[in-house]
């Protein structure tokens, strides 16, 4: 369903936005994992 864009018509801005969204998503994942880890350690110290 249009998941793979035709390489003949690729808008550089779209590519940049895609990379940006990927990077943001990756950072959010990492942050939430760090948060989970921190919560775990806090629970263990109590």
UniProtKB/Swiss-Prot annotation:
The modification Isoleucine amide is found at residue 46. InterPro entries: Corticotropin-releasing_fac_CS (IPR018446), CRF (IPR000187). It comes from the Eukaryota. It is found in: Secreted. Pfam families: CRF. Regulation of fluid secretion. Stimulates primary urine secretion by Malpighian tubules and causes a dose-dependent stimulation of cAMP levels in the tubules. Belongs to the sauvagine/corticotropin-releasing factor/urotensin I family. This is Diuretic hormone. It comes from Zootermopsis nevadensis.
């Amino acid at each position: 369903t249009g998941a793979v864009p035709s390489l003949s018509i690729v808008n550089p801005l779209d590519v940049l936005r895609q990379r940006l969204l990927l990077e943001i998503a990756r950072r959010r994942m990492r942050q939430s994992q760090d948060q989970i880890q921190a919560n775990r350690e806090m629970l263990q110290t109590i």
